[in-house]
A protein has these predicted regions:
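Short, charge-rich amphipathic interface segments used for partner binding and complex assembly
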Residues: 30, 34-63
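N-terminal acidic leader/helix
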Residues: 1-23, 27
Length: 63
């Protein structure tokens, strides 16, 4: 899939992803359920890959 984003949209997406990643890290640390924690870790890894792609496509959002 390909998406074209304006610089502003890319920056907004990166900001949202960073916030979500921070929230996920906190939730991973707080959960005692191993299966749920594994699912959260998988989601975090996926979102980290998306963020990396956004940052590579638009280096201005990497800050």
């Amino acid at each position: 899939m390909r998406m074209e984003l304006t610089d502003e949209e890319a920056a907004d997406l990166a900001t949202t992803l960073r916030g979500t990643l921070g929230d996920l890290s906190s939730e991973i640390a707080a959960t005692d359920n191993a299966a749920y924690r594994d699912g959260l870790r998988a989601r975090r890894a996926s979102l980290e890959r998306v963020l990396a792609k956004v940052e590579v496509s638009n280096p201005a959002v990497g800050t």
